[in-house]
Amino acid sequence: MTITEEDLIEPLRKVVEYSPPRRFLETVDMIVNVKGVDLSDPSQRIDKEVVLPHGRGKPVNVCVIAEGEMAREAEEAGATVINREKLEELAENVREAKKIARRHEFFYAQVDLMPDVGRVLGPVLGPRGKMAKPVPPNADIRALIERAHRTARVRMRDQPVIHTVIGARNMEPEQLAENAMAVLREITSELEKSWAQIDSVYVKTTMGPAERVY
């Protein structure tokens, strides 16, 4: 059995309309329980990024480790920028490095700074699955940052469960359903038996109750 956008719309409508109002814009999340995977085999652990058709619905924190023109463009695009000097300061301040790792969803680094990024931030970014992606000198850092604002991380850790964002509460259920389907298609494409390995699917707002889809 597969899930369609139509299957998702009503559960999404319920979680958006009936969850108690909050003082902040909640995200809408999807929880996918998978069966028949051997997590001791790294090749069976899903770790992907999915560009959502309608975006995340709210900004995401992006950190760029760079200098010069790339740093300037990244800052203008709204990213947090760490230069070489700040990076070396973080080498002596693990607490601050961990705080930066927690607060940011995506990390990019000027390619020639990657060895230093690995040395200083690798220990805090690696376990979180957030290791910085190298950016060559001719790359459009603005485009990468813009893409990050439309991207969901789809990652399976120590349990056969994927918990990911599919949008924000102020989005239409139909938009959220399209985003959810993009994520589900990516997940099932990584599974040997595709939809047969999907055990259950739930949707919820950040602080609201979960609604079962499948």
Swiss-Prot record:
Assigned keywords, A-Z: Repressor, Ribonucleoprotein, Ribosomal protein, RNA-binding, rRNA-binding, Translation regulation, tRNA-binding
The keyword Ribonucleoprotein appears for this protein: yes
GO biological process: one example: regulation of translation
Gene Ontology molecular function, alphabetical: rRNA binding; structural constituent of ribosome; tRNA binding
InterPro entries tied to this protein: Ribosomal_uL1, Ribosomal_uL1-like, Ribosomal_uL1/biogenesis, Ribosomal_uL1_3-a/b-sand, Ribosomal_uL1_arc
Lineage: superkingdom: Archaea
One GO cellular component, as annotated: large ribosomal subunit
Assembly description: Part of the 50S ribosomal subunit.
Family membership noted in the UniProt record: Belongs to the universal ribosomal protein uL1 family.
Function field: Binds directly to 23S rRNA. Probably involved in E site tRNA release. Protein L1 is also a translational repressor protein, it controls the translation of its operon by binding to its mRNA.
Protein name per UniProt: Large ribosomal subunit protein uL1
Organism name: Methanopyrus kandleri (strain AV19 / DSM 6324 / JCM 9639 / NBRC 100938)
Gene responsible for this protein: rpl1
